[in-house]
Amino acid sequence: MIVLKATQDKVLAVLQSVAGIVERRHTLPILANVLIRKTGNALQLTTSDLEIQIRTTAELGGDTGDFTTTVGARKLIDILRTMPGDQTVSLESQQSKLVLKGGKSRFTLQSLPAEDFPLVQESAAFGPAFSVPQKTLKDLLGQVSFAMAVQDIRYYLNGILFVAEGKTLSLVATDGHRLAFASATLDVEVPKQEVILPRKTVIELQRLLSDAGGENQPHIEMQFANNQAKFTFGGMEFVTKLVEGKFPDYNRVIPKNHKNSITLGRAPLLASLQRTAIMTSDKFKGVRLNIEPGTLRVASNNAEQEEAVDELDIDYGGDTIEIGFNVTYLIDALANMGQDMVKVELSDGNSSALMTIPDNDSFKYVVMPMRI
């Protein structure tokens, strides 16, 4: 049976949309495979790592009929990448193997039985569905994902908190040193739901989501259950397990009523920090900010007695403050805000700083100071 027959670019795009979660080496060899299910003209591809399952349906030609098998996903992609985009390729079943043909090339691949592929059991208790433009969710993820912890023993920090309540969707991430919050308005009102999405899920969603805008921009539908989240978009169904545990009360972490605030251009501040970061210690990455009426001075030095000083003119008439930060934490936030102006609020040299967008509550970033 000819399972599919289409140009290389079409086949590769469909395979790549589901293959991001596939590991080359796994304790279960079949998890390195993609589950192929042909029903009539429709071809369904499914991958899983036991935590996440991605499924997409496409029409890629071939014979009409019913057929199921599994084959190595990465190997198939590696072969397809070596072929021209406009070349017609076909995948044929021959006994227990699959044969990939393209031009004068022929590849015989081993398959494993479809019935051995471990499908994720979907929850029967998903909450009400709601949707946002894919670009909106991609932007929100970009504004907070850099603050996720990496392999923290506090496992609930290794991901992003999603909070849907009323007509607001909020995303929060923290690694204990900094906290990023971003929110967007929903078209419908939803009951309060809170879930923590794992780090791998977040990274995969960012890869797959479209950033196309405009009137007909594609949407993503979301549903949450106690132990799962489901996302439906672009012909794909994305089901993921959740991180168990209690996320910190982010409202208590976000400081209020700072005595001093500066509003300045995001790009000049980012450029100043990137310049002074060159002279920081590889280990500590610390910069000092000296803030006084009219001037913001950014300084750094390292163990080789080298130093950098950069000054910015600011509209400021508050207290004189000297405070240290991990420069990477500041750069991460400024690089992902996507706005022209930034507001920095401070109380003194020993308290956390709050970065926001002027006259906009949709983004908040809290960063702890650092002794230098």
List the model feature ranges, each with a label.
Residues M1-I372:
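Structural preference for solvent-exposed beta-strand-turn elements
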